[in-house]
Regions:
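Gly/Gly-Pro- and Ser/Thr-rich, intrinsically disordered tail segments characteristic of DNA damage-repair
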Residues: 1-178
Length: 178
């Protein structure tokens, strides 16, 4: 699998949305920015989903149609429909791509040891528990992943364990595609 996570600044398209050309020649329709970006991304792959603040594309099946990763990345940047710069990150697991994107947007360094060295604040499932995890001295995905399974699930719920299992490739990812 090859995932690309994209994010635009919150004010990228304005509150009104974006105008999309109609195929029947009628006047352009103005659609909400988030919806318009989703439709735009479907030209690259049929596997597109909004996950939190990121538009996530699974492109492994369509890379050959775009002559590889570099060409696809260039095409995404060149055809960016929003007036603002698009931030992007790529990884073999979508959840890790989103975490890398969050670090990139914040201007933080990207750790080499992924997913173990990723900060917990970049994991959506860990956000409700950040204060407690921090008090326990746990700051990275790897430190939480190393906890015994059953006590961790009792304390933090199954969502965090499931997210870590996905990040380590122990469970498949699934998203509601557009």
């Amino acid at each position: 699998m090859h995932w690309i996570a994209l994010q635009w600044p919150p004010d990228a398209g304005g509150a009104a949305g974006m105008a999309l050309p109609a195929s029947d020649g009628s006047p352009d329709a103005v659609v909400p920015m988030r919806e318009a970006l989703g439709w735009w991304a479907l030209q690259f792959t049929p596997h597109v989903a909004w996950v939190d603040e990121a538009l996530l594309l699974e492109v492994s099946g369509s890379l050959r149609l775009w002559d590889g990763r570099a060409a696809l990345q260039r095409r995404i940047i060149e055809s960016n429909p929003a007036p603002a710069h698009v931030h992007q990150a790529q990884e073999a697991i979508g959840m890790i791509a989103i975490a890398m994107l969050r670090l990139r947007v914040q201007g933080q360094p990207l750790p080499a040891d992924r997913p173990a060295a990723l900060p917990l604040a970049t994991l959506t499932a860990a956000r409700p528990h950040l204060a407690l995890l921090s008090r326990l001295g746990l700051r990275t995905w790897g430190e939480v992943h190393a906890l015994p399974r059953a006590p961790m699930v009792r304390r933090f719920g199954p969502e965090l364990r499931r997210a870590l299992d996905i990040a380590w490739g122990l469970m498949p990812e699934s998203y509601p595609w557009l």
